[in-house]
Amino acid sequence: MATSSHQGAAAGSQMEHRLCETSIGQGERPRASRGQESNFKQSQGTSTLRLLLLGKQGAGKSATGNTILGKAVFESRFSHHMVTKRCQSESVSVRGKQVIVIDTPDLFSSLGCPEVQQQNLRQCLDLLADPYVLLLVTPIGHSTEEDKKTIEGIQGVFGPQAYRHMIVVFTREDELGEDTLQNHIESKKYLKKLIENIGSQRCCAFNNKADKKQQELQVSQFLDAIEFLMMESPGTYFEPLKTENSGVQGCGTGVTYKGDNLCGSKKRQPQITGPGWDRDTPELRVLLMGKRGVGKSAAGNSILGKQVFKTQFSEKQRVTEAFASHSRLWNQKKFLIIDSPEISSWKLDESDVKEHTFPGPHAFLLVTPLGSSLKSGDSVFSIIKRIFGEKFIKFTIILFTRKEDFEGQDLDTFTKENDALCNLIQIFEGRYAVFNYRATVEEEQSQVGKLLSQIESVVQHHNNKPCVIREKELLNIILLGRSGVGKSATGNTILGRPAFVSQLRAQPVTSRSQSGRRTLDWQDIVVVDTPSLNQMSGTEKNPAQLKKEIKQCLLQNCEEGMKVFVLVFQLGRFTQEDEAVVEQLEASFEENIMKYMIVLFTRKEDLGDGDLYDFTNNTKNKVLKRIFKKCKGRVCAFNNKETGEDQETQVKALLTIANDLKRSYDEHSTSWMDQLKSAVGQITTVFK
């Protein structure tokens, strides 16, 4: 009987989470401590970690994935049949790292369909990128031949290094009763051998029906096991998955694959060899992008060799309203061509982009008419860059359409004489193609073939790795202002907890810079509370000293990522001291520092039924008006006594302004980053 989530005992039972406490045949090993959290956080310099769930049908992979994610994402229920039928993934931010959990069906069962297993295995490997951890999920209780076959299959696919990068997760912990996990392992020869190979510090037990508090404890201890793995395996995590023949070998499915031929074999080592395509070859995702009316859909149809995407002339509305995709074979490879709506709509909702291209396109086709005014500073680039990062340029080919409009003109001469066009081509390192929609059938096939050959070269250049979607950047918020305006209370509101001392006193409460951290809506936030600028030693008469103090504050408290200065005032009480703070900042960092500031008023509750917009527009204070103008209206207000959803709403409003601030400057200029880098002594940038 198979189940995806059956865990035995009642959910409310409080079970002690058991880790193996001693090594079996390997001596004692130190347990990863909280002080070693940086091992997980840094993980060889990358900000993303992938966890691949592997195990037999009914082992509890989906339920375990949901426990790690802290939410029910993967379908998990009792069933005689396989519940998870394809690979799927979901991400969560944990301890400052983006963790992608990949759920899989049973990939290694001798009872499964070999063709389906091969397809699932290919999809699984296509989702992987370094670094990743193999999670072998196995239930406590009666073991079957399928448990052993799973271990053999993992070894066959991932090679002799599989043990080095494996963590074993035992599900149905509640079924241990009064027994220990170590005794359970000792009672099974294959389990004992497995744990001897990987080390007892890299196994843990889950009760996926435990209450929330107990599940959080389980996940915390599970993360400790990952930290221990990272301490043991520094540097590059895994060798490349491909064999010398570019094939995947040794799945333990009872068949051998070679091309499209299925051959019986007792070696249980399926092979997919050579560069040729078969039904299990991963698709090469090619994303068509551009403004409305540039001919993306028509270009897609030409590449596919058939009319599948809707095309028509329309001046008033978009023809392509949603993402759509179709595939074709070329040169024994499968290309998935993804048509997209007008690129300006992407900034409204990035979820569709991610859904249709996950984990990322292998190539981008930037479609634009040959005589267009598309320039390097166009908003098109900032939108793509925001989702995929600067690296998208290396994956992009410009596809110029409407060559027929320039009939009789030499293309090379035309591009060289057009400075904007020449600059655009240089940015993309000379990668471009041209389509003529009045071409003959033979000419059209030739231009499509040349383009696909270029795409193939881009894919090969990146070793078949896609341009993965950019994770959200960490945001550093540096609070500045005079003493008594509520900087510490504001910091506590942003963090959602009382991290900084905040009291009503005649003397300043905050005497030194300090920081706190939280994650909200998948964005990691570091809040830096600072003492009053005029309380910093020697800064009142020496602007250079103030610059030095703030630089030191950034170095000691900020983390890598974008940094935003928030100038805090108290609503209805703008004093000469506040004005002096602004003057000090402008004197130390040049007057235009205010262009990169956000103004935040505390005591929002004093507005009563009033509106912040009316307050800022109707104020008679000339200094405040000047500040609002220089900050380009980036103003918000906090009631630091709010709690729950009202508190979160305030924080999200500030984060929206902060992210929009960076985005607006990304779209229009990069020189300001150099200015601010110089302002803090060329030690750090405000946005990185």
Curated annotation (Swiss-Prot):
Q: Residue ranges of region G2?
A: 82-86
Q: Where is this region: Disordered?
A: 22-44
Tissues in which the protein is found: Spleen, thymus and T-cells. Greatly reduced in T-cells from lymphopenic rats.
Q: Where is this region: G4?
A: 171-174
Kindly list the places in or outside the cell where this protein is found, as annotated in its UniProt entry: Endoplasmic reticulum; Golgi apparatus; Mitochondrion; Cytoplasm, Cytosol
Give the AIG1-type G domain ranges. Answer: 46-246, 281-471, 472-681
What superkingdom does the record give? Eukaryota
Q: Where is the composition biased (Polar residues)?
A: 35-44
What is any one GO biological process for this UniProt entry? Answer: regulation of T cell apoptotic process
Q: Name one GO cellular component term.
A: endoplasmic reticulum
Has UniProt tagged this entry with the keyword Lyase? no
Region annotation G1: where it falls in the sequence: 55-62
Where is region (G3) located? 103-106
| Region called G5, residue ranges | 207-209
Specify which residues bind GTP according to the UniProt entry for this protein. G55, K56, Q57, G58, A59, G60, K61, S62, A63, S76, R172, E173, D174, N208
- Annotated keywords: Coiled coil, Cytoplasm, Endoplasmic reticulum, Golgi apparatus, GTP-binding, Mitochondrion, Nucleotide-binding, Repeat
Under the heading InterPro entries, the entry gives: G_AIG1, GIMA/IAN/Toc, P-loop_NTPase
> Chief location of this protein?
endoplasmic reticulum
Q: Which GO terms describe its molecular function?
A: GTP binding
- According to its UniProt record, which protein family does this protein belong to? Belongs to the TRAFAC class TrmE-Era-EngA-EngB-Septin-like GTPase superfamily. AIG1/Toc34/Toc159-like paraseptin GTPase family. IAN subfamily.
Q: What is the role of the protein in this entry?
A: Exerts an anti-apoptotic effect in the immune system and is involved in responses to infections.
Protein name per UniProt:
GTPase IMAP family member 8
